[in-house]
Amino acid sequence: MAEREEEGKLYLRMYHDVCMEHVSAALERVVDAAEIPLRRVSEEESGRPALPGGWSRKQVLGHLIDSASNNHQRFVRAALADALEFPAYDTPGSVRVQAVASAAWPMLVDLWASYNRYLVHVIRRLPAAKLEVVCRIGSNAPVSLGYLAEDYVRHLVHHLDRIGVATRS
């Protein structure tokens, strides 16, 4: 019985190493691929809507910084708990309250890139035993901590693609 338990722990560690290394490496590639194109955007261009009727690049990047901040807390708190509930996320309210549209574009790019590089570090070190911790965010269906990390990268790529920033190097 103890031997099977050890085999299970070994499998979980191997799964974690592959899964979280894949997620963190994907995030790192996205940041590396997107940072230079983001830095090439002028202050003026960053304030214009990327798509007709949509948010400006500043607002999108501000949202992604806020997403990094929210998910950082989710990753760390879930890794310290057996289950966790988080409040719903008010995207438009958050962008408005933080006055992202009046922030300097280079500062936003610096913060976005640095915060996401730190999240690469955090994701790589999430404990294997905590990847299945159940997380509830607002009224959404419960998901695992591992899923949150994977979905964070998908969300980031989606928004960068929407503002015309290539995420593949």
Regions found by a protein language model. Give the residues of each.
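Terminal targeting/low-complexity segments that flank the catalytic cores of oxidoreductases
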Residues: 1-29
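Short, contiguous alpha-helical
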Residues: 2-13, 47-91, 117-128, 132-169
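Short amphipathic alpha-helical segments at helix-loop
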Residues: 15-19, 56, 97-104, 140-144
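A generic "alpha-helical surface" signal
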Residues: 21, 25-28, 58, 62, ...
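Acidic/histidine-rich alpha-helical segments that form the ligand environment
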Residues: 26-39, 94-132
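Cytochrome P450 catalytic-domain "roof"
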Residues: 40-48
